[in-house]
Amino acid sequence: MMNSINLENTYTSLPPEFFRYTEAEAMPDVNVVTINEQLADLLNIDIGFLKSQSGLRFLSGKNSKTLPNSISLAYAGHQFGHLVPQLGDGRAVLLGDKICQDGVRRDIQLKGSGKTYFSRGGDGRAGIGPVTVSYTHLTLPTICSV
């Protein structure tokens, strides 16, 4: 198991229109509520590390030594019946990505990390309730939380 987390950020090889470098806003009084041990194992992340001060800095996006390239992603989509050519992560920072024990590359994203380049009125932080929905992941394989 790793007691630190080495991440790549393959998205930064894309043209700059697809992302903006973003640093998570400071989070006071960070603590662990629960840990998804199965996911931590898949990601090869030591649970003891996640509970440590270094792990808490990582989980809050504040470990600049290992996260020099955190970003927010841009995307397009329909909103209120109209195509909006530039939307983006208004309250999420992509810390990086890594190839897991099963050979699949997975993104590590901090949800509710504060305002980003793409933020609008209600964006920024996330309460424990909405984050819990991601944690339980409702059997959707595309989202799960450590």
Predicted regions and their residues:
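Nucleotide/phosphate-binding site architecture used for ATP/NTP-dependent chemistry
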Residues: 1-135
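Conserved small/polar residues in nucleotide/adenosyl-binding loops
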Residues: 136-142
